[in-house]
Amino acid sequence: MTREEKSIAIGDLTEKLAGTNILYVADISGLNAETTSNLRRACFKAGIKLEVVKNTLLVKAMEASDKDFGDLPLTLKGNTSIFFADVANGPAKIIKDFRKKSDKPLLKGAFINDEIYIGDNLLDSLVNLKSRDEVIGEIIGLLQSPAKRVIAALLNNAESKGEVAE
């Protein structure tokens, strides 16, 4: 790769990093072609972009980015693949699903909404993260619950008064 190609690749990666709040870094080395293809297919179906990158280029892109990736660049050793997603737990679910059949991919770390998660031991925690839509749904449910009770009590009270008047 020439210097010009490297600078273009760093620029592209920097743009992608700026455009996402959810980034997973994993090691998919050792997966055969069929399994890698299945992983890519599963990512595509889930709306996740999977790319294999050079560590040095990714480190430079992280340094050039406005975001603080903390110690995440320190995890970039060996083969590295990055998952770009819109749902916080999407890549974790795919990684966990693939780990049922194989010991790979290994999670190196994740950057989720300015929070850094480092280590494969956090995979279960990341799987259990709620998506934005799930959190909004829970909040709406919590807000609606007291209002429904008040309305039900008022209707119940009105019905009981109506029966007495008759």
Swiss-Prot record:
Q: Where is the signal peptide?
A: none
Query: Known Gene3D superfamilies for this protein?
Result: 3.30.70.1730
Q: Cellular component GO terms, alphabetically? A: ribonucleoprotein complex; ribosome
Q: Name one GO biological process term.
A: translation
Task: Report the domain of life of the source organism.
Answer: Bacteria
Q: What InterPro entries does the entry give?
A: Ribosomal_uL10, Ribosomal_uL10-like_sf, Ribosomal_uL10_bac, Ribosomal_uL10_bac_type
Molecular function terms from GO: large ribosomal subunit rRNA binding
User: Which keywords appear in this protein's UniProt record, sorted alphabetically?
Assistant: Ribonucleoprotein, Ribosomal protein, RNA-binding, rRNA-binding
Q: Into which family does the record put it? A: Belongs to the universal ribosomal protein uL10 family.
How is the subunit organization of this protein annotated in UniProt?
Answer: Part of the ribosomal stalk of the 50S ribosomal subunit. The N-terminus interacts with L11 and the large rRNA to form the base of the stalk. The C-terminus forms an elongated spine to which L12 dimers bind in a sequential fashion forming a multimeric L10(L12)X complex.
This chain's function reads: Forms part of the ribosomal stalk, playing a central role in the interaction of the ribosome with GTP-bound translation factors.
The name this protein carries in UniProt is Large ribosomal subunit protein uL10
